[in-house]
Amino acid sequence: MRFLMFVAILFAVGLFLYRRRSFVEKSPAAQLTTGQIKQAWRELGFFCELDDRDRTWTLTGSRAGLLRFRDLLLAYVADPRHALQSEYEQYGPYGSLEVMTWPAAGFDGQSIRGSLPDLARLAGLVETKLAAAQPDSVLLIREEFAPDSAYTLRLDVRDDWFDPASADPDRLGAATKLPAPKTKG
């Protein structure tokens, strides 16, 4: 009986912390320069945007850039610190992309969440969908990962020279594409 009470209290505290964070406003890292913000998007490999109106998490990048999301998920799963419920990491220059350990898989207005096996499965889904993706295609993930989820993960696939910083709504990336590498001859 005491054990069940302890588990119920832990669950309530976890739920409280989870819900409380959704009310805390996320502010951009004011200390970052425009150049640092651009570089952070490029290092991440894709641009991330949450649209609460359309209930979508949109990741925009080249196939290689979007595969970094798969790698990010696999690294999250491999880190033993994330084994506990409510553990999370934030990514991107604004910390807007949040991956969270949670018993039920899903997408919501705060995070992309699930158990570690769920998040590993999501990484596999991303890899599988991107394997045959062509530039200018849009891939949706919800039914295969969390059919009851209110939000959808949208992968907006661009060409190989796409610059993720160019998708920032503040237009921090001036060019829409990175320059093509120079070829000999």
Annotate the PLM regions.
Residues 8-14:
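Intrinsically disordered, low-complexity and often Lys/Arg-enriched segments
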Residues 14-185:
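Positively charged, low-complexity terminal tracts
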